[in-house]
């Protein structure tokens, strides 16, 4: 899996304007006619500065554009991330959500962090979105050349409920490490870890994200933070053992002060739902995205190189929902 982004990351103002555009589109649309019977669907995402929130916003924007016709109103919820989304869909409190492919696999099969809860056989895939290389970022003056150099350092392992945290714990276990191997294992959210690095509160952080990402752009621009390659026997073992992992490369020069490419591994962001969500609802959501695919790709730089043929198969860790399957078959994608 190689992350290749054709358009370099611009200034932060571009991110602010893009986010504002999505928010404005979601909030300013004219109400649907009173005669239309409204159905509300909610999408669980992640922190408001992350790519998951942008993905949910992009999907809802396209769904809501024609809600007067199909009667579905879509809303985005900022959440703790992948694990939270999977659990909340299972509880029936979210209709759809974005989850890492490894989290989806574990939730469906009752493995990893879901072992105690047991399998969730009703989890269904809708489509995959973007690749998510695991990214290690360190303070410029921390002298961190490899992940092993972080032993004894102050390191952010991800907030509870996030896919980042789940993947971090799996990597540590494979390495034979625990959280006690760090002098501080902080649990900051993605919109907090960049400033913590620049303020000298932590030495680095681990983050699974689609690139380019504002939460990595900020510390690399503001204080010259460095991306650290994540390779070695533990990574090779994980990639060989689990179908949802793959080696990945973050392109050279994607972020300021990081002229070389960064070798790592990662997962895929996937859009999921429950088998209990009606086929017609999922069909409508999928149709809104793929009938307006060029518009969808423009709503975040991480979506720029997406291809429908890949999104119907890559990284899907649960069976495809019948509503999604119907649309993809109609379009010859299956």
Please place each PLM-identified region on the residue numbering:
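Short, glycine-/small- and polar/acidic-enriched structural segments
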Residues: 37-151, 159, 227
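Ligand-binding clefts/hinges and TM-proximal coupling segments of bilobed small-molecule sensing domains
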Residues: 153-170, 244-313
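C-terminal segment of classical bacterial N-terminal signal peptides
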Residues: 24-34
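Sec-exported extracytoplasmic/periplasmic mature domains
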Residues: 60-69, 90-94, 109, 173-177, ...
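Pocket-lining segment of extracytoplasmic ligand-binding domains
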Residues: 101-103, 112-113, 142, 178-272, ...
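An extracytoplasmic/periplasmic, membrane-proximal ligand-sensing/linker region
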Residues: 192, 199, 209-227, 237-240, ...
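Bilobed "Venus flytrap"/periplasmic-binding protein-like clamshell domains
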Residues: 40-66, 128, 132-199, 294-297, ...
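Bacterial N-terminal signal peptides that target proteins for export
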Residues: 2-21
């Amino acid at each position: 899996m190689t992350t290749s982004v054709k358009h370099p990351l611009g200034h932060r103002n571009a991110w602010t304007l893009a986010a504002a555009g999505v928010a404005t589109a979601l909030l300013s649309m004219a109400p649907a006619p009173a005669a239309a019977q409204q159905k509300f669907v909610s999408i669980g995402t992640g922190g408001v500065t992350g790519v998951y929130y942008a993905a949910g916003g992009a999907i809802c924007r396209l769904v809501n554009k024609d809600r007067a016709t199909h009667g579905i109103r879509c809303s985005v919820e900022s959440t703790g991330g992948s694990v939270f989304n999977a659990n909340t869909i299972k509880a029936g409190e979210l209709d759809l959500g974005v989850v890492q492919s490894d989290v989806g696999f574990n939730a469906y099969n009752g493995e990893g962090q879901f072992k105690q809860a047991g399998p969730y056989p009703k989890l269904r895939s809708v489509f995959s979105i973007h690749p998510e290389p695991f990214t290690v970022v360190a303070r410029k003056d921390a002298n961190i050349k490899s992940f092993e150099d972080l032993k004894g350092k102050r390191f952010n392992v991800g907030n509870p409920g996030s896919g980042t945290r789940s993947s971090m714990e799996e990597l540590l276990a494979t390495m034979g490490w625990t959280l006690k191997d760090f002098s501080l294992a902080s649990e900051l959210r993605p919109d907090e870890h960049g400033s913590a690095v620049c303020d000298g509160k932590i030495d680095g952080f681990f983050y699974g994200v689609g690139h380019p990402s504002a939460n990595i752009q900020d510390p690399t621009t503001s204080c010259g933070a460095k991306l650290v390659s994540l390779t070695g026997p533990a990574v090779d073992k994980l990639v060989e053992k689990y179908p949802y992992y793959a080696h990945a490369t973050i392109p050279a020069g994607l972020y300021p002060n990081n002229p070389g490419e960064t070798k790592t591994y990662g997962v895929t962001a996937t859009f999921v739902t429950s088998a209990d969500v009606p086929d017609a609802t999922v069909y409508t959501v999928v149709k809104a995205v793929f009938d307006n695919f060029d518009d969808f790709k423009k709503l975040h730089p991480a979506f720029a190189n997406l291809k429908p043929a890949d999104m119907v198969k890559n990284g899907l860790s649960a069976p495809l929902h019948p509503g999604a399957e119907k649309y993809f078959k109609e379009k010859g994608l299956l």
